[in-house]
Amino acid sequence: MSEQTGTFYAVSVGPGDPELLTLQAVRVLENTPVIAAPQTASGQMLALDIARGAVDLTGKSVLPLRFTMSHDAAVRAESYRAAATAVEAELRQGRDVAMVNLGDVALFATAYYIFAEIERDGFPARMLPGVTSVAAV
């Protein structure tokens, strides 16, 4: 990317307890103007709720991302592409975006797929590891 763009952060929020967010995750969430979060069909955003238990997100833009649970890989890929496109619109405006994800973003995480799309498109991107449920017990 030649123009100044924002950075995408894939942020792990751990297995459910807001006290298990890493210091790095808290710092990035405090300093990032746009928070992206997976949203269920019923409108629930569990990862965002966990983050809110650790960080005051007042005044931040929330970008809900909808993902399919389809068994069809092409349908899932289309869902990831749509989410990446929504995030990239913010990045092009120079705004950093933190996508919250349950557990650790490097292990079976939706954020990992979005990270790969965004990185492939040439935007700066970072993964912030977190506490897994196995490590939390």
Task: Report the location of each language-model feature.
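Class I S-adenosyl-L-methionine
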Residues: 1-18, 23-25, 30-126
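Short hydrophobic alpha-helical segments that form membrane-spanning helices or hydrophobic packing faces
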Residues: 23, 136-137
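Short, flexible loop segments at boundaries between secondary-structure elements
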Residues: 129-136
